[in-house]
Each structure stands twice: as C-alpha cells, then as structure tokens.
C-alpha cells in the first residue's frame, strides 16, 4: 500500500472553488491543446520505465496518468480527499517527471509539465511528500535545500582551500570575485556531506587556469526541488537567486555541478 501524502493542514476540507481557482489560470491555450490533442496512440508507453518495470501495466502509460486533470475539470473540482490521495499515489509513486514520454510524443505533449500541474494542485490542498516540503522550506529560509547558512557555506569553501594548499600550491577558491569568467554553483549536499567534490572541481579549474568564483550569498545551490512538487513560486525564486548573483558579480557564465 502506498504511503499517505503528507498533509500540511490535516483538517483542511476540500474546497471545489479553490481547486478551480488554482487550475483555471494555468489551463491556457497550450494546456488545453495538450489535453485535447492526445490520440491515445500509446507511443509514450514503452518510454516509461514504470510501465516496463510493471509488466506493461496499462495504468502505467504516461498519457493515462494525466487523466486526472480532465476528470477534475469535468467534476468542477468536486472531489474528496480519497480521490486526491489516488492522484497523489499516481503522480508521485508512478512518475518521476523524467520527460522521456515527452520526447517520444508525436504531438509534443509535455506530460511531465502536466504532472507538475497536478503536483502543484495537491500542494495547494496540503498534500506533498514530507522530504520535498522540508527542502522547499529550507530554500525559502536559507536559499538552499540543505539549510546551510551563509557562514557555514563560506567556512566550508575556505576549509576546502586550506586542505588543498599543500597538494596544489597557489590553488584558490575565489569567493565573490567580480568580473570572473565563470560563477560556479553546486549541489547543496556537497558542502553539507561531500566537500571533496568541491575540492576536485577546484583542482580542475586551477590546473586549467580558469577564471572563476563562487558566490557567498544565496544562489550557489543549483538544485531546484521545488519544481518537483509544483511550487512554481519557490522554483522561480531559486533560479532568480542564481541569476541575481551572476549579475552582481558581473560574470560571463554560470557553471553547474555534475
């Protein structure tokens, strides 16, 4: 049995008007076209690893998973918590938004984006995985998913530089260097758990003679878990933080980890 969705407001009742108010502004011409143009050809089926791993269960076909949007619109948002739990189980446990299905769709229907819309709808009703909610809260408070403070981030960078001092004489990890060619960003798990990854990249930049820097303020975390629960507002904030730092430091390019 699939685990129940985390509910931010346990006693919150489902409000049909609230559901429709969430969906209507987002169902523009593009979404309407996608919802109406699907020919149920099944070409997306074999692209889905959930479909293949389940013994080709028809319920795992990507096009079938997004049926909930049309159902909710047809019902004018009049659904119960049990129905939304069914939606949750499908869009979180049977899809990871990899977009393989989108690449193979002859009509270019972005099924992952439709799944994201459903995840955003569930979030508006207080339903999302606890881990994602915690990460989103960390983004909002600290600017990164791992709740790393500015002080800890800078201290980690300085420690990495010190650790490599004997191995590579003259190696520096510039912080807030204006006019550098590259601003390097990382996965927030690196300063938290894997600082050696930062050190390896620093070695590459040093040997290559690259002109680079890292920002001290929010914008150094290049992950964006908010988009995986349909939180567009927070997802936008994360990206804007990175662009803001790049503009402030007047760099030419932004490079990301991995």
Give, region by region, the residue ranges found by the protein language model.
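Secretory targeting signatures
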Residues: 1-2
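N-terminal cysteine/histidine-rich coordination modules
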Residues: 6-40, 45-82, 87
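Iron-sulfur-cluster electron-transfer modules
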Residues: 25-28, 32-35, 65, 70-257
